[in-house]
């Protein structure tokens, strides 16, 4: 069994034979359902892009836990400069296997910076752990190539999709992404953290209809797969 816990905003904790964090923005996150010090036993930390609400506490948690940070090559180098005692693995889109976990870094339509300088390209991740396939979209707009993710790496057991609009897809666009990805389940994320990304997950659920099971998680709740 694999458990996918929503930590608020776009942060998730995946637990199976390995323990994986994605975009661990906890400090300063008004939705946060955990603290960095809660993760002393983590194997991998996946970071989709350099914005502070995604890179978050990745470096500090890696220090605490000894976890490896996986990120776009440029971002991995940036993290290594700030946290010289942390192991990073740089990628540049494509599949790999790290400690028995199959990971595909895939494109996302967004930006990636520290607020001043651009730091590599944004990404999403497809993770296969214990025969469960999870897609975390990162911050992105909908794009047709999402069909390829389903074709190459599907069936996708659960897709974690932003629905807040303004910086990412809104509910309508995310519902279209569900059509392209064909996941069995979908969890909305990246909404209602702050007013600019206000969205109604029930409206998203209505728009998705019977194309997938929409699971609306509150921060701290988990989905068992």
Curated annotation (Swiss-Prot):
<comment type="similarity">
    <text>Belongs to the UPF0173 family.</text>
</comment>
<dbReference type="InterPro" id="IPR022877">
    <property type="entry name" value="UPF0173"/>
</dbReference>
<dbReference type="InterPro" id="IPR001279">
    <property type="entry name" value="Metallo-B-lactamas"/>
</dbReference>
<dbReference type="GO" id="GO:0016787">
    <property type="term" value="F:hydrolase activity"/>
</dbReference>
<dbReference type="InterPro" id="IPR036866">
    <property type="entry name" value="RibonucZ/Hydroxyglut_hydro"/>
</dbReference>
<protein>
    <recommendedName>
        <fullName>UPF0173 metal-dependent hydrolase PH1671</fullName>
    </recommendedName>
</protein>
<dbReference type="Pfam" id="PF13483">
    <property type="entry name" value="Lactamase_B_3"/>
</dbReference>
<dbReference type="InterPro" id="IPR050114">
    <property type="entry name" value="UPF0173_UPF0282_UlaG_hydrolase"/>
</dbReference>
<keyword id="KW-0378">Hydrolase</keyword>
